[in-house]
Amino acid sequence: MSTHADDARFKLALEQWLLLHADDPTGVSFVEFAGHSCVVKRYRAKWFSPLIAGLKFAKVVVLSWLCWLLMGERPSPQRLLKNNLQDEAQRLVRLKDAGSSVPKVWYHAPEVLVLEYAGQDMPYLIRMATPEGRLGLMSRAAQELANFHRAGFVHGGAQLRNLMVSDDGTATRIDFEENIGEALSLPLAQAYDVFQMVSSMAGLRGHEFGLNERQMLCHQLLAGYLGANPDPMVRAQLISIEKHFAVIKKYLGWCLKSIPGRDIQGFLYVANTLRLSLCDE
């Protein structure tokens, strides 16, 4: 499939590149075809792919039960595993047809997906911005996710790294491999998107901002989202998640604070953000 069917130069350049790189390993490449900046995602099966698939299924089963323990819903592992390049291409086409700001799909095949280049990732912009500029970026990211949710959609990969901004200021959501939207109820899936967004800010690498600013940026993200999308069902799911986090922090907080690492410390930031933003409930 190609939306550049009438662009012979684009098709020729793409075909030549795919032929030249037919044996390339799994990965992502940034390539320009006939003046069009593109992102090429490739998947190459290997002899040990069945083993990887088995480990992946085991991981998904564990995550499914963990989701049930923390959020009250157990998503189907089979649905969560609908996350190959073809699945992503189909989701992107549906979202694009519905008017969402997602990359155009130039071409897709079982092991190849070619998308339009969407711009610079949000984490880079956050690191380069002034403190005031970062607050503005938090408001922008929160508003973009709120708009996406109000339209009835779920991202499933709502980390800040998957929000791109082009030179003209257009924001585009990328990376729709995960099938969270079909595996969970809509309110919980959207609440999970919010959690991913805030958690990604909590764990964002960078020496440009200190602990207090990081916590403030997390709070700005959540407050901005709740102000732009005051959906009571999504809020109720966030409150439920906060209660589970509070229990974990109550009994294990003393231990977690002593463990270094972005993931653990990010959990504490998110727990504090949810508590402070939802404390009026």
Task: Label each PLM-derived region with a short phrase.
Residues 166, 176-280:
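C-lobe/activation-segment region of protein kinase-like
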